[in-house]
Amino acid sequence: MAETHPVDVHPPYLYPDYKSTRLRAPAQPLVRVAPSPLETAGPVFPKRFVGESEADLTTWGTSAPLGEKMVLVGRLLDEDGRPVPRALIEVWQANASGKYPHPVDDHDAPLDPNFLGKGQVLTDDEGRYRVVTVKPGAYPWQNHPFGWRPAHIHFSLFGNSYAQRLITQMFFPGDPLLAIDPIFQSVPEAGRKLLIADLDLEQGIECVALGYRWDLVVRGPRATPMGV
């Protein structure tokens, strides 16, 4: 039987079409450094570390935010398909107009006073998470002429130590901007589909919100691309 090798699904440090990588990609070979005990110890997140309301990004204001409300569910799994419980998941995103409430965001789009675009949730004992939000809008960026970022949600995952933080992005099915987005295209072809959520109407709320499902795998041949 021929030996098989796992397919690398993670983006390279340098992807010239994504201009920021030209500045931050390492110019020399990486040097492996053994982690210190402080980096590998803790945190252990208790069940009450995050309040339930922090996973609902639509309840920060005095009224509902503008945009297409959605419910996003999924599981955090290891390479053997086992759940990763009590992992801290942080999310952040633009509002429905494609605007971040950040001083460096100069996109000529309105802010939504009822939407801050950030939240967090702890996975349960089965590795499950649930986030309520609005679908983010696309927005222009100056990476290349006529550049627009597709709708996406940023994810940050914390394991059982601060040295185990992983960052990635989730995208939406059928978005035509994916084909011209250098960040998405920097991911090897085998990994791109792993970054796209599935429409799952049963997870939505009748006449209120669409449902999406997106599972994350932290290691192994089915790993979700990280560093996106």
State where each predicted segment sits.
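Beta-strand-dominated extracellular/periplasmic modules and repeats
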Residues: 1-228
